Amino acid sequence: MDHYCTVRDMNHGIKPKDGPVLVTGASRGVGSIAAMILASMGYRVTASTGRPEEAAWLYKTVGVEEIINRSELASPGKPLQKERWAAAIDTVGSHTLCNACAGVRYGSIVAACGMAQGMDLMGNVAPFILRGVTLKGIDSVMFAKEKRAAIWQQAVQYLPESRMDSLTTVYPLSDAITVAEKLLSGGIRGRAVIQCS
C-alpha cells in the first residue's frame, strides 16, 4: 500500500512532462512497485539501484527509462546539486535521501518511505529554503483501514494483478529464514511474499 500512497502523495502537481522521477531502491519491493506505477502513469523513471545485473528487468518489466548506480547517492553530497529530477521517491533514507532532496528541481517533492541505508538524515536546509522542496513522510503503519481500501482500488488501474505478479516471488514458509537472509544481503529482486498456508 505504501508504494501507491507514495506515488499519490508524490504528485504535488508534478506532471509527466515536468521531467524524470527518481526512485531509489528500485530493484526491491517498494521501489520496483513505485517505479512501475509511475511508468504506468506516464512518468519517466530514473531508477537507483546497487544491482546492475537487474538492468534488463528494470527496463523491460518495471518500465524505467534510466538507471543510475546507488553509489552516486550513497555518500554525503553538496547541499544543493544539479536539478536532475522533477520529484523523487526514496525507499533508502540516510545520505541517499539527502542527495535526492538536493537533486530535485525547484518546487518539487521527495517522498520518504524507507530506511534501508539508515534512519539518519544528515542533510541541510538548502533544498527546502532555496528551492522550496517538500519532504513528505509516508506512513503505511497507522494509515486508516478505510483509506487503504480506497487507495488499493485506485492503484489497480495502474498496477493490475498480472503486472504485480511480474514483480512478486512467492516462497513457502519453510524458506522464510533463507529469504530473510537474502533480503538483508540485497539478494532479492522485487517483492518477496511468504505463503503461510
Regions picked out by a protein language model, each given a short descriptive name:
Residues 39-95:
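Adenosine-nucleotide cofactor-binding segment
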Residues 35-36, 56, 98-101, 126, ...:
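Alpha-helical segments flanking ligand/cofactor-binding loops in enzyme cores
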Residues 95-161, 196:
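Glycine-rich phosphate-binding loop and adjacent beta-alpha segment
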Residues 1-40:
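Short internal alpha-helix immediately C-terminal to a glycine-rich phosphate-binding loop
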Residues 31, 55, 97-98, 120-121, ...:
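Short, well-ordered alpha-helical microsegments
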Residues 10-18, 68-85, 142-143, 163:
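Short, flexible, glycine-rich and Lys/Arg-enriched loop motifs at helix boundaries
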